[in-house]
């Protein structure tokens, strides 16, 4: 967020835990929307601990609508798979099949997309969840 905060040529969107109680703690509040030329080009969608998949996908819909309105040329996804219900450090409630749904939703944007794995600590399920995103994206 910080490196893009004053830029209008890149839209930054993040769905994450509410920083008042969850990581990233020090930034990512909904009111942080950018500054100067970047005002309005930073969208934080913080969610309460224990948020359901329905809540998370509601935030994803908001994110995708904003990305579509922006008219992006490409999409870079910092893919945090710590949203998995079985993740030892997270309180989100996504299940394995939700990751395929995530991939499908991002594919519907019709943008060249790069996925960068950023988090996910349920080691036994991490690979399956990552593959589910890619398979959903490619379907």
Predicted regions mapped to residue ranges:
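Conserved alpha-helical scaffold segments that buttress catalytic/binding sites
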Residues: 1-107, 134-135
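Secondary-structure boundary/capping motif
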Residues: 55, 122-126
């Amino acid at each position: 967020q910080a490196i893009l905060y004053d830029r209008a040529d890149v839209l930054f969107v993040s769905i994450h835990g509410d920083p008042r109680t969850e990581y990233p703690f020090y930034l990512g509040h909904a009111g942080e929307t950018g500054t100067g030329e970047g005002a309005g080009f930073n969208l934080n969608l913080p969610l309460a601990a224990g948020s359901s998949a329905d809540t998370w996908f509601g935030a994803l819909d908001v994110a995708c609508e904003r990305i579509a309105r922006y008219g992006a040329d490409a999409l870079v996804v910092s893919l945090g798979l710590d949203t998995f219900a079985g993740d030892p450090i997270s309180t989100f409630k996504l299940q394995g099949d939700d990751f395929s749904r995530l991939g499908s939703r991002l594919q519907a944007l019709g943008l060249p997309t790069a996925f960068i794995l950023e988090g996910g600590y349920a080691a036994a399920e991490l690979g399956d969840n990552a593959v589910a995103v890619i398979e959903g994206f490619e379907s």
